[in-house]
Amino acid sequence: MIITFPGSPYKLNQAFQPAGDQPEAIRILVEGIESGLSFQTLLGVTGSGKTFTIANMIARLGRPAIIMAPNKTLAAQLYAEMREFFPENAVEYFVSYYDYYQPEAYVPSRDLFIEKDSSINEHIEQMRLSATKSLLEREDAIIVATVSCIYGIGDPVDYHGMILHVREHEKISQRDIIQRLTGMQYQRNEFEFARGTFRVRGDVLDVFPAENSETALRISLFDDEVESMTLFDPLTGQTRQKVSRYTVYPSSHYVTPRSTTLRAIETIKTELTGRLNYFHENHKLVEAQRLEQRTRFDLEMLNELGFCKGIENYSRHLSGRQPGDPPPTLIDYLPDNALMIIDESHVTVPQIGGMYKGDRSRKENLVAYGFRLPSALDNRPLRFEEFEKLMPQTIFVSATPADYEIQRSGQIAEQVVRPTGLVDPVIIIRPVTTQVDDLMSEVSLRAAQNERVLVTTLTKRMAEDLTDYFSDHGIRVRYLHSDIDTVERVEIIRDLRLGKFDVLVGINLLREGLDIPEVSLVGILDADKEGFLRSERSLIQTMGRAARHVNGTVILYADKITNSMRRAIDETERRRNKQKLFNQQNNITPRGVNKRIKDLIDGVYDSENAAEHRKVAQIQARYAAMDEAQLAKEIQRLEKSMLEAARNMEFEQAAQYRDEIKNLRSKLFIGIIDPDEIREVPQTAGKKSRRKAGR
């Protein structure tokens, strides 16, 4: 059911009315924003519907919003939920686009210089560009971001100044359009039409916008006049719609006008001269020679091409900032009336504070030893005090808010009662000595009931070793930690929900906000090891992962009860009692959370994977519709194909035909076709067969 509010551009897809503590929390937050409160906190337990409350608040206020999450996994989850709540509005995703990133560094003790190395995820880069476009164009924009949003991107003034507006019947030559596109870092490519490219065919110019993955623009010109414009499918060429005007945005956040680049070159030369004098005066000739060689090369590249490798280190010169000025970030693109929601604030706020110092310590070595100019220090994330000055009206969201949030907040809205009636999980304490074997027996019980299990360890090595041990004993298990890239993390969580495996082992990523309703057991190993991973807040957050299941249970493996454990257990018991009282007073029977399993991020599966799934679905449907006689004929056909493949020495393909025949024969024998067990037979040798989950 779509709901709208007076004066708000948002259309809220609301399947149910706010219940429990939600209506009061929504009222408090909305009134707080309207009365001008700078900071508020939503203290909501796991499973109480905090995201639904925030969505209602945004819809009622009708203002653009940025939602910050502590990691990419939670950002993807929030993005998926917000898209479901606001299917007709601009919900965007802004996280780091690096799948792999090795920053530039120098180790003086070993005289070792490490070059910058990175791998950029094209799809996430497109989503980042789409996010800034929505902020510039629309009032109904909701940006879901990580702490990546406090790192420098292009100056919004330069970015906005480079935008190309094209209108029907406008007087503009093809040469001028090409020149503008080239300045916006679009590349001419007549053979491969991809994002951020354009091609020219006679009087027709095709542009593939960098922020779009599905639609391209065709501009037809006649005698230096735009005759018509159409949006078309870049793959099939099919026309989608005619448009009278269109705005083409730069292909990168880091575009700069030619005049700005030339001005920056002069200021870089001035800084270089001063730095070389410093090195010579201090008899650091190696550093001077190194700096001059590297910087002169970069200046030549900037002059000839408009960019160079490591151009971000000259961002202060390109944006015209003074030394020490904060860099332009995504927050500078926010409208004046925007809202900021910091999810899991007890983790996200300290993250923001820690980014600057870590970046600074690495770059100081590069500057001191002549690898970079001192201005490279200004290519940095925001300092915490700079971030605070830029914060619009802000809502902190957490089940365990820290002292910072509580002290800054004008008011705190509590959301402790769950509309579903679910109570906090039962907590059991067991000894450390038998923790692995005890946990394995508990896992087997849960797997038999088609329930999932989360296990937290203290180190990556422990997580991997435990995964190997469980796997050797026939348990379907995977691990999740920081070495796994963004897209794979999302796939792992999705596969856990789908039941492709039963146990997920992790360290610090199995805490804040992870929404897996199928999880009925959380096992916390070495719970009595006092520290960051076993603090009161960490324990409450980890235990909360089992709070979305009717049979939610937490097992703490400990030989002693620490102060953190005691406080976490007491708080959980307090919340259990409050929920039980609410259930009794309102005659509510607890019911589990049922959430549709969907892709968290569009495009996380590659085209080959998607094609494979389509092919498998077709095979499943075909086999399911066959009678016994048709199945027998299909087996004969596959046998011929198997022998033919063997004669051609395509043994992998022959083995897969053999497996398929065996599978069909077993189904023919018992007279049942189970679509989940039909596997695709690849058409080319060397491709892996589609295995059953758990193999």
From Swiss-Prot:
InterPro entries for this protein: Helicase/UvrB_N, Helicase_ATP-bd, Helicase_C-like, P-loop_NTPase, UVR_dom, UVR_dom_sf, UvrB, UvrB_inter
MF (Gene Ontology): ATP binding; ATP hydrolysis activity; DNA binding; excinuclease ABC activity
Signal sequence segment: none
GO BP, sorted A to Z: nucleotide-excision repair; SOS response
SMART domains on file: DEXDc, HELICc
Domain of life: Bacteria
Assigned GO CC terms: cytoplasm; excinuclease repair complex
Keyword vocabulary terms for this entry: ATP-binding, Cytoplasm, DNA damage, DNA excision, DNA repair, Excision nuclease, Nucleotide-binding, SOS response
Key word ATP-binding present: yes
Primary location group: cytoplasm
Its job: The UvrABC repair system catalyzes the recognition and processing of DNA lesions. A damage recognition complex composed of 2 UvrA and 2 UvrB subunits scans DNA for abnormalities. Upon binding of the UvrA(2)B(2) complex to a putative damaged site, the DNA wraps around one UvrB monomer. DNA wrap is dependent on ATP binding by UvrB and probably causes local melting of the DNA helix, facilitating insertion of UvrB beta-hairpin between the DNA strands. Then UvrB probes one DNA strand for the presence of a lesion.
Domain commentary: The beta-hairpin motif is involved in DNA binding.
Family to which the UniProt record says this protein belongs: Belongs to the UvrB family.
Name of the molecule in the record: UvrABC system protein B
Source organism of the structure: Nitrosomonas europaea (strain ATCC 19718 / CIP 103999 / KCTC 2705 / NBRC 14298)
Gene name for this UniProt entry: uvrB
